[in-house]
Amino acid sequence: MENINSRLIKEFAITMEQAESVIQLLDEGNTVPFIARYRKERTGGLDDIILRNFTERLIYLRNLEERKADVIRLIGEQEKLTEEIEKSINKSETLTEIEDIYRPYKPKKRTRAIIAIEKGLKPLAETIFSGGFKGDINDYAQGFVCEDKLVSNALDALAGAGDIISEMISDEADYRKWIRGQVHNFGSVETKGSSEDTTPFEMYYEYKEGIKTIPPHRILAINRGEKSKILSVKIKADNDKIIDYLRNKCLKGNSETDKFIELSIIDSVKRLIFPSIEREIRSELTEKGEIGAIDIFKANLKALLMQSPIKGKVVLGFDPGFRTGCKIAVLDDTGKVLDIATVYATAGSQDGVKKSIAIIKDLVIKHNVEVVSLGNGTASRESEEILAQIITELKQECSRDLYYVIVSEAGASVYSASELASKEYPDIDVSIRGAISIGRRLQDPLVELVKIDPKAIGVGQYQHDVAPKKLDESLKGVVEDCVNAVGVDLNIATPALLAYISGINAAIAQNIVAYREENGKFKARKELLKVKRLGAKAYEQCAGFLRVMESNEFLDNTSIHPESYNATKKLLDFLNYTKEDLKSLNFKDMDERIKDINFNELALKLETGAPTLRDIIKEIKKPGRDPREELPKPILKTGVVQMKDLKPGMKLMGTVRNVSDFGAFVDIGVHQDGLVHISQLSDKFVKHPLDVVSVGDIVEVSVIEVDEKRKRISLSMKN
């Protein structure tokens, strides 16, 4: 365990105390959101991202220690374990190193070497490989001829001995480690196209890039091309250098045996070592590609979920379509459905379009709609033109302001047909549910998007080339962190949302809703303890992330944990706040009252930690604050810009819709996202686009080039 802790300290640049505390907290069953938010004193303020990476690494290192113990036991059972082997295993830092050491002792299928050993040729191989043999090698090999064992002559015996030596060289852990490093550091990935046709993989038809430097997105693109049988892929390395290295290690200066050993070296490299290391390198590259894709997906998903909500506005959700019509849902400022309609605004006769416009205008006026949330799918461009016309007419006819925002409708159709949607809207047609989802995504992106499988949200890069289980686990962690960072209203939250709260699983989430339906709204956080299967530990983990607006205890509607209520009340008393101040939540002058306070001394006096005290003060100054409100709001539009209107040099405001390894895709309102290539993101060097932009960012861009035929827009964020 000490070894694990030491490695974690180095890798995460933390203290031994931090490492031990985090491990203990995790082993006690505490969740990452709970530890990040309410155990800052013990972790030294490590955030949720570091804690998740720490947890993942801890699991890997523990598995590593288990494998070490297994390999030591397995070699010991063969009575071949030496002190040196055990020491080498314990020093290993990766599973690959352990498997290299175990390789000679691992049960094998019947290889050429094993067949030769069965023929009694191992002593011949060992004698030759030792370099101590004197005399004629062919005469010596004659002594191993045995017709019964299918060793007909000296050449057969030497061929079998060569196979054994080849495998002995291949199984040597130190040799493999050096060769693997050589291939990794100086080798390359080379690809060739098997077709002359134009395909998405055209750039890889004659391609070469260093193993060490190839970026994740190219690895996955090459893998996809290979899987489609459009590309052939090889790992290339300097085999002559590898053979020279093995010559220096294996040749003994014996002219009689060295020629023979050299043939075994060449055979070992070409037949055993290189193909095996090529498979390992390809596997490592795929893992690198998957990690890169998952990291980008996580960052994009987090930014999307944490987009600033548009609160307190009546919204019209607009799901565009042609043949089946456009689906409309009007939502009040809490997301409740006020009205629904189907209009044929983008297809059909002029009379039909006029009727559709009239219906939409009536809905806007009747329900005092302020913003339209327009889905970006089929018929979105045509629908946008209709909306622009409606906005102009409403302004002229009754001086009414109306805006629209184009919203990604990715996953809306999946949600519409889901069991969850059926439970939420049993009496509303499946086709209308998509419009409700599109409208609610504008009102509260987080609450609405957690209902959808993250993979269906459409912000991934090569997500279909990543192991599903690995991707699911990573994305679930992102959603959990976002939901807990914002907090949830206990009395209106759906089971889908509650299930992401720290300490609550799907079953407990259903029990909470069942309790609420049977007993009415929760009156206090502590009432959670009456919910079936929600015990003291689950309550500790979840309470701080659940808000109860109806509670008489105002702290129940903050992110302050119940365990800190006493400290909070002592603080307010210390700062001379009255009961009237508490009732009216009048803490505007808090900064003035605490400006001369020594936080560490006050924390001791209140029997809490300084980080917790700072969090308490931050929350009291703005009870129930939503961290998303500090982020930029979506761009509200009133008119249409078309691709043909764009000219090089034109400056526009846009919203980042997706980020990849090679750049960012920005929505500038023309139904075709423009690409800001990584080289155009800044005047300074940019290592990765995520260092500069995130999904949802509002950015100023200038147009570099427009290709209407290929529907490509090149943008720049340089000054």
Protein language model annotation of sequence segments:
Residues 1-20, 27:
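Generic start-of-chain signal for non-secretory N-termini
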Residues 4, 18, 28-34, 47-53, ...:
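Helical mechanochemical/support elements of P-loop NTPase systems and associated helical scaffolds
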Residues 34, 232-234, 314-317, 327-330, ...:
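Structured core elements
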Residues 38-40, 238, 320, 333-334, ...:
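Short, ordered loop/turn segments at secondary-structure junctions
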Residues 50-53, 60, 64-317, 323-427, ...:
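Duplex nucleic acid-engaging cores and interfaces of nucleic-acid transaction enzymes
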Residues 270-276, 402-489, 494, 544-638, ...:
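OB-fold/S1-family RNA-binding modules
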